[in-house]
Amino acid sequence: MGRSPCFFKSFKGKLHKDRSPDPSTLASPHPSTEARRPVEAGSAEWTWGWMKRLPPASLSPGIAMSCYSGDSMLQKYKVKNAYRLHWQGREEPGASTFASLVFQ
């Protein structure tokens, strides 16, 4: 089995007035293969990363998705909101995506 199709790192930036993330305020431009562990169930956190082999419907609010943390423990998340910075009509590594995830 391969790794999870999604890789995220914590979003350490500011939000626009419409609550979408402002990419110009990111602490680091580099994606990470580590997922931050939830502090408590049901907490929400802004994350960003890139998608690999993940159909666009998977980014719909309320759709469950999975991500591997640094210690290879499978973590489950639900998407609260998602904002694509660019998408070229096909799933492709490197397509930047912001998502508000609710940890389960």
Curated annotation (Swiss-Prot):
Residues 12-40 are annotated as: Disordered. Residues 22-31 have a biased composition (Polar residues). It comes from the Eukaryota. This is Uncharacterized protein FAM167A-AS1. It comes from Homo sapiens. The gene is FAM167A-AS1.
